[in-house]
From Swiss-Prot:
Predominant location: cytoplasm
Binding residue positions for [4Fe-4S] cluster 2: 176, 180, 183
EC numbers: 2.8.4.3
The protein's name in its UniProt record: tRNA-2-methylthio-N(6)-dimethylallyladenosine synthase
Chain ranges of the MTTase N-terminal domain: 23-139
Gene Ontology CC: cytosol
Binding site for [4Fe-4S] cluster 1: 32, 68, 102
Similarity comment text for this entry: Belongs to the methylthiotransferase family. MiaB subfamily.
Taxonomic source organism: Mycolicibacterium smegmatis (strain ATCC 700084 / mc(2)155) (Mycobacterium smegmatis)
Cofactor note: Binds 2 [4Fe-4S] clusters. One cluster is coordinated with 3 cysteines and an exchangeable S-adenosyl-L-methionine.
Length: 512
């Protein structure tokens, strides 16, 4: 294992050493929204260091895997893909493979034991080291493994190459102070570290200046925001997240604000008040339930109970009547009885979720739940999972049918859901987050534009709007998407940058 070299600097590194050809890269992302945004940062780092994104369908000189360790098949997926690259690596020793993210943080040296052709292994706390590690591996002709145990300061200085011209992730924190027994994330991403509000708002402003219309505030537990920079001598200000939402409401040109994910135990009334009072905060809430059984919630070490969860939903709907509420659910947690599972079905029925991400419990080594007795047979978990899916699909369809006849404002998107090509429908997201497939008619509509149309049909996972367009608005985001331009950010906290300086956020041609 190669230890971290504190004196190594990526500044000025160029990947085409000894060659006039610019080397290309590809980032493959597995897992949650955190990983998606981390991959944008990895792309920004590589581009700042002189690499170029590989064209679609071409072989990249550098392949970076940004991994997930939450699901049971994460290992198989990674090592299967690494095996597919082994012949390419053998044929072209100058090709490089890097593995980062949660699985790399967890497995460390095991990655090289199982796939010795990998060049770089890096963790969740040092993604900024990637250009340096790649160059060092090439120069030394030796694999580099660098894992940092803890994040001391939020890495706001890292540039990001965004995937969308119209919508963007903005991290407000990393890590988590909760200790859910099924979750390995806190041990891999560490304790919560929050960004200062000024740095968050500066990044949001930079994105809006480039034409971005929608931002999603991102954290493992967004409504615990502020805990890491609170004065330990003073009572904790639990209103920091609500204040942040209201501050986003004051940014001209920012049309939509979303956030994910809150924790029910930390959810306070001031957040609901801020959601209702801030016009650009979208009428939607994604809040993980995980189980409707109080006994299982206790075993999961989730510090709330079903009654509190349902109480929060009631308050949200009282303040924001048309809010779309979604959740996460786990089926088959160790020791879950039929009675426990029925409690989950009962809460789902009462909550009337617009949608739910449902998971079969996945045993993860290193978590307390993995060592619990009464692990359920796969057949039982699968049968319960199917019953839960059937219930939620029915509720989702009923909820979506209530939207038929309503006018909806859509932010036109690309790559959203499956559409029948023969209908020539486009897709967009309503303000409440629902996916809508709509007919553009004779209008020239681009991803990033805003349209208003009428819902004419419903399915469990989407709405149909085949009515004529009521209104359309061309946007700078639409202009940028059409021109192939995407925003870049690199808002700093005084930390040294990696690689060449990122372009100015207001540089001509960014128009997105």
């Amino acid at each position: 294992m190669v230890t971290r070299d504190e004196t190594a600097e990526a500044e000025g590194l160029r990947p085409a050493v000894g060659s006039s050809r610019v080397r290309t890269y590809q980032v493959r992302t597995y897992g949650c929204q955190m990983n998606v945004h981390d991959s944008e940062r990895l792309s920004g780092l590589l581009e700042s260091a002189g690499y170029q994104r590989a064209a679609e369908g071409t072989d990249a000189d550098i392949v970076v895997f940004n991994t997930c360790a939450v699901r049971e098949n994460a290992d198989n997926k990674l090592y299967g893909n690494l095996s597919h690259l082994a012949p390419r690596k053998q044929a072209d020793p100058n090709m490089q493979i890097a593995v980062g993210g949660c699985l790399a943080q967890k497995d460390r040296d095991a990655v090289l034991r199982r796939a010795p052709w990998v060049d770089v292994v890096f963790g969740t706390h040092n993604i900024g080291s990637l250009p340096t590690l790649l160059e060092r591996a090439r120069h030394n002709r030796e694999a580099q493994v660098e894992i940092v145990e803890a994040l001391q300061e939020f890495p706001s200085a890292l540039p990001a190459s965004r995937e969308s011209a119209y919508a963007a992730w903005v991290s407000i924190s990393v890590g988590c102070n909760n200790t859910c027994t099924f979750c390995i994330v806190p041990s891999l991403r560490g304790k919560e570290v929050d960004r200062r509000p000024g740095d968050i708002l500066a990044e949001v402003q930079s994105l809006v200046d480039q034409g971005v219309l929608e931002i999603t505030l991102l954290g493992q537990n967004v409504n615990a925001y502020g805990v890491s920079f609170a004065d330990p001598e003073l009572p904790r200000d639990r209103g920091a997240f609500a204040k942040l939402l209201r501050a986003c409401g004051g940014i001209d040109g920012l049309e939509r604000v979303r956030f994910t994910s809150p924790h029910p135990a930390e959810f306070t009334d001031d957040v609901i008040e801020a959601m209702a009072a801030t016009p650009n905060v979208c009428p939607t809430l994604h809040m993980p339930l995980q189980s409707g059984s109080d006994r299982i919630l206790k075993a999961m070490r989730r510090s709330y109970r079903a009654e509190r969860f349902l109480g929060i939903i009631d308050k949200v709907r009282a303040a924001i009547p048309h809010a779309a509420i979604t959740t996460d659910l786990i089926v088959g947690f160790p020791g879950e009885t039929e009675e426990d599972f029925q409690a989950t079905l009962d809460v789902v029925e009462q909550a009337r979720f617009a949608g739910a991400f449902t998971f079969q419990y996945s045993k993860r080594p290193g978590t307390p739940a993995a060592d619990m007795p009464d692990q359920l047979p796969k057949s039982v978990v699968t049968e319960r999972y199917q019953r839960l899916i059937e219930l939620q699909e029915r509720i989702s369809l009923e909820q979506n049918r209530e939207q038929v006849g309503r006018a909806v404002e859509l932010l036109v998107a690309t790559g959203e859901g499956r559409k029948d090509a023969s209908t020539a429908r486009m897709s967009g997201r309503a303000r409440d987050g629902r996916l809508v497939h709509f007919l553009p008619g004779d209008n020239e509509i681009r991803p990033g534009d805003i349209v208003t149309t009428t819902v004419t049909g419903a399915a469990p996972h989407h709405l149909i709007a085949d009515a004529p367009i009521i209104e359309r608005r061309r946007t700078r985001a639409g202009d940028a998407h059409a021109a192939g331009q995407k925003p870049r950010t690199g808002v700093g906290l005084g930390m040294p940058r990696i690689g060449a300086p990122a372009p100015s956020a207001t540089a001509e041609g960014c128009g997105c």
